[in-house]
């Protein structure tokens, strides 16, 4: 009988990962799964492991400073083991979204919007940090603890994105594919630069200050925006796609605060709002893309991830709770949950 369909496939050159939903045991038996002279199915599997970890890391930023550690770990198992693979199969497993013509090269929707939708569901049930919003609706800034470290983290992400997008070609077997990877690298970098510059300019015009956190999120927004299709745009088009992402992330962060949706690092805006823009932007550069298919992918992925995440977050909240106590939040979750201080150099001994 014919084998069952693969769990994931690459969007790229019609190569399909043969790691099947019933075949994960092959990985644990350390059997080398078939590929060809230039492509390994096992490398495709590893990419999916990294991608789902990326989606879960988006959630971690949005629920920071008030989430129970073990409740977070429990949801991580659910997202990585169930929620993500289902919608991942829809596109990268030759599923119905792939058949419908939905395009997502490296995961603006499958990875980034997925993580943002799961984060939004959790944040709505979790609530805002204490003191974030005043009784009259005012938004109180809670500055990050270490901006140089945040800048370093953004640089690391920027560099890592070359592997995220360029590696999504999955194989380099001839000069054409080598040139394709090089173009992906260039477009990825240009989009990040465009996002950073335009987020910085908008924050200066809007707030009167060159906001570093907005600039850093602008760079990430540019990267997310180009992830859906980094191969077909020209470098100039990639810059503009990233620039629009940089503008959108600033507007989205401000609007979410007005709605009292507390996202400490702007993860929902960076990966959700801009992830949607990235999927729509494919229509401007890829002649194979259709607006209908892209909208279908956006709605279906968001609806699946948000609905299932909300159900599981709600169940966890009712069974074990998801939020630390007010005293633990004031003390710091690093101390209350882990028994360690993240920044002991700033704590005076009594």
PLM ranges: what are they?
Residues 38-77:
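Hydrophobic alpha-helical hairpins/lids featuring a short glycine-rich hinge
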Residues 1-28:
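Single conserved hydrophobic/aromatic residue that forms the stacking wall/gate
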Residues 68-76, 210-219, 266-269:
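Cytoplasmic-side transmembrane-helix entry/capping segments in multi-pass membrane proteins
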Residues 41-50, 181-192, 236-243:
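Structural signature of hydrophobic alpha-helical transmembrane segments
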Residues 49, 53-62, 80-89, 116-120, ...:
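Transmembrane alpha-helical segments of multi-pass membrane transport proteins and ion-pumping complexes
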Residues 132-142, 316-350:
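Extramembrane terminal tails and long inter-domain/linker segments of multi-pass membrane proteins
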Residues 22, 26-47, 90-107, 136-137, ...:
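Inter-helical loop and helix-membrane interface segments of multi-pass membrane transporters/permeases
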Residues 132-195:
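Core mid-bundle transmembrane helix pairs that form the ion/substrate translocation pathway
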């Amino acid at each position: 009988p014919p084998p069952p369909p693969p769990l994931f496939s690459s969007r790229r050159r019609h190569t399909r990962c043969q790691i099947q939903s019933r075949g994960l045991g092959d990985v644990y038996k350390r059997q080398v799964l078939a590929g060809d002279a230039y492509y390994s199915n096992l490398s495709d599997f590893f990419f999916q492991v990294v991608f789902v970890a990326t989606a879960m890391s988006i959630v971690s930023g949005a629920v920071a400073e008030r989430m129970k550690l073990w409740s977070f770990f429990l949801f991580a198992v659910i997202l990585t083991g169930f929620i993500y693979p289902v919608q991942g199969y829809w596109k990268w497993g030759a599923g119905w979204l792939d058949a419908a013509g939905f395009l997502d090269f490296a995961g603006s929707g499958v990875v980034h919007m997925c993580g943002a939708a799961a984060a939004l569901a959790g944040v709505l049930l979790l609530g805002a940090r204490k003191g974030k919003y005043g009784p009259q609706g005012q938004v109180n800034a809670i500055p990050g603890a270490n901006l140089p470290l945040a800048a370093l983290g953004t640089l690391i992400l920027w560099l890592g994105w070359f592997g995220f997008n360029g590696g999504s070609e999955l194989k380099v077997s001839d000069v054409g594919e080598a040139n394709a990877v090089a173009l992906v690298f260039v477009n990825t970098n240009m989009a990040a630069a465009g996002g950073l510059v335009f987020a910085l300019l908008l924050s200066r015009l809007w707030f009167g200050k060159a906001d570093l956190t907005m600039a850093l999120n602008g760079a990430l927004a540019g990267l997310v925006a180009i992830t859906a299709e980094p191969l077909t745009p020209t470098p100039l088009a990639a810059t503009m796609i990233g620039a629009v992402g940089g503008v959108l992330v600033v507007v989205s962060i401000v609007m979410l605060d007005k709605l009292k949706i507390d996202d400490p690092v702007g993860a929902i805006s960076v990966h959700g709002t801009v992830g949607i823009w990235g999927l729509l932007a494919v229509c401007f550069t890829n002649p194979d893309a259709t607006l209908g298919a892209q909208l279908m992918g956006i709605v279906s992925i968001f609806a699946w991830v948000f609905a299932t995440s909300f159900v599981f977050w709600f169940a966890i909240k009712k069974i074990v709770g998801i939020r630390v106590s007010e005293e633990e939040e004031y003390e710091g979750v690093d101390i209350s949950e882990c028994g360690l201080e993240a920044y002991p150099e700033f704590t005076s001994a009594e």
